[in-house]
Regions:
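Helix-biased detector of long, well-ordered alpha-helical tracts
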Residues: 1-329
Length: 329
């Protein structure tokens, strides 16, 4: 569903006031947060994807990492997971289903969470994801809003997985580039979140289906600020930009471009289709975090020490120049 259509649908829903619901659907945040006590709040989220790869085990890993990421984006710790499966039992054998679940379990275990059950339904094609419950202190969770003027923006993973998966279906992506993409997607955002928790972050979101620009726009609007992004600093997966140059795209680019139209300014002309990478839909993408400039280099260094080699400082938070909430320079 398009982000614009989804927003209209959610805005039309009746809203129940509950003082313990600290984060609902009104702010397009990554997960809901519900206070249980003065010390504990639940982080609740669900996500489901179609297979970006043929290998069932890897599909399960990607689907699980993608779902668990929303808890990390809220500053939470994942605790329990439920499998959400759509499966064509007449077309695919039980070994495929088993591979998906086993792959997911490796990531659930790595996240130090537990698999508590799930639900499987008959479907025309495989679909997989998790409903995840996490915990966080009710006064210490992160929002996708609240970025402060003067803060620096760090992105923890490369972008470009959407176009690479489509191009791979056409046999256009070199094996090494495709494997690097998969390695990124099965990497949990656990280490990135653990590093960020050591610093004074003001806003965090994970980059998924709306692309870097779409999720950055949500952060900018929610923060009443403008995010200035350095085009040359944004980490891009090998061959992704090349695929756009060859005319490959995704089914989400058009809707993602519509989301940012009227709110984005490019301060330099981009050749060909190179601007498409910023609306490329991600699966299990990285975290985008705003934190003080005085802390950014140390945070980046700790991420690199933790093996997050793709992490980069990609921009700054500026006073709002609405309607230009995003400025690419």
């Amino acid at each position: 569903m398009s982000p614009v259509g989804l927003d209209k649908l959610l805005q039309a829903l009746p809203k129940k006031v509950d003082p313990n619901l600290l984060v609902g659907f009104e702010t397009s945040d990554d997960a809901g947060v519900y206070r249980l006590t003065d010390e504990v709040a639940l982080v609740v989220t669900a996500d489901i994807i179609t297979p970006p790869v043929d290998d069932p085990f890897v599909f399960g890993q990607i689907g699980a990492a993608n779902s668990i990421s929303d808890v990390y984006a809220m500053g939470g710790r994942p605790v329990t997971c439920l499998n959400l499966l759509g499966f064509p039992t007449k077309e695919l054998g039980p070994e495929v289903l088993q591979g998906i679940v086993e792959g997911a379990l490796t990531k659930i275990t790595e996240a130090e969470a537990v698999l508590a059950g799930g639900h499987t339904t008959e479907d025309e094609e495989p679909k997989f994801g998790l409903a995840v419950t996490g915990v966080v202190h009710p006064e210490k969770f992160w929002h996708n809003k609240g970025a402060r003027q003067g803060d620096v923006l760090i992105l923890t993973k490369r972008i470009g997985s959407g176009v690479l998966f489509n191009a791979n279906l056409k046999g256009l992506v070199p094996e090494a580039a495709m494997q690097a993409c998969i390695d990124s997607l099965i990497t949990l955002n656990k280490s990135a979140a653990e590093v960020l928790q050591q610093f004074d972050v003001s806003a965090v979101t994970d980059i998924t289906g709306f692309g870097l620009a779409g999720h950055a726009l949500e952060m900018a609007k929610g923060s009443d600020a403008t995010l200035e992004l350095d085009i040359d600093a944004i980490p891009v997966m090998a061959e992704a930009a090349n695929m756009y140059d060859k005319g490959v795209t995704t089914g989400s680019n058009l809707n993602n471009r519509a989301l940012i139209t009227g709110h984005t300014r490019f301060d330099r002309e981009l050749p060909g289709n190179s601007g498409e990478i910023f609306v490329d839909p991600q699966t299990s993408g990285g975290l985008l975090a705003a934190l003080p400039e005085s802390q950014a280099q140390e945070a980046l260094g700790r991420m690199h020490d933790a093996g997050l080699d793709a992490a980069r400082i990609i921009g700054h938070v500026l006073p709002s120049s609405a309607p230009d909430y995003l400025v690419f320079k």
